[in-house]
């Protein structure tokens, strides 16, 4: 295996795709799991568990958190993933409103449950706008 093939395996065929044997697209994984593919369910559970571990680790390192922000493909578009990541996070002050989570509205949507100590937000990603802003900044230097 040459270096390009190795990078392809590490970057494209490992992680959730490697565990599931299906895909790295969470929509495909959720559909496969609904159809009985236990490996797809395991891959999703492992991913969500990893996100929880990172939240807990960073909360410990920072002495707590003020907000959790979900963005990008999975964070922005997958209510099930957000719910699973936030499940059992009450100890940290994270609780989400089920209805708001399942139907986020606007580019910035607060899905925090009433009484939660940590705000939980879903923020739309606009990568093209960020690239344009960064390009403008570089060109103006």
Regions found by a protein language model. Give the residues of each.
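A conserved active-site cap/scaffold subdomain adjacent to cofactor or substrate pockets
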Residues: 1-12
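Alpha-helix initiation and N-capping motif
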Residues: 3-4, 22-26, 82, 132
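Adenine-nucleotide phosphate-binding core of ATP-dependent small-molecule kinases
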Residues: 8, 15-19, 26-61
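Glycine-rich beta-alpha junction loops
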Residues: 14, 74
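Short, surface-exposed linear patches
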Residues: 22, 32-33, 90-93
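Internal helix-turn-beta structural module
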Residues: 41-61, 65, 69, 75-141
């Amino acid at each position: 295996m040459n270096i390009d093939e190795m990078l392809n395996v590490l970057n494209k065929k490992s992680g959730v795709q490697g565990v599931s044997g299906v895909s790295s697209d969470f929509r495909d994984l959720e559909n496969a799991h609904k159809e009985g593919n236990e490996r797809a369910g395991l891959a999703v559970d492992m991913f969500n568990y990893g996100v929880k571990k990172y939240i807990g680790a960073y909360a410990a390192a920072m002495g707590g958190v003020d907000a959790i922000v979900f963005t990008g493909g999975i964070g922005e578009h997958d209510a099930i993933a957000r719910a699973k990541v936030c499940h059992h996070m009450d100890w940290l002050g994270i609780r989400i409103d089920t209805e708001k989570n399942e139907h986020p509205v606007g580019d910035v949507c607060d899905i925090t449950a009433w009484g939660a100590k940590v705000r939980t937000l879903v923020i739309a990603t606009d990568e093209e706008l960020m690239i344009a802003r960064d390009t403008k900044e570089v060109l103006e230097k």
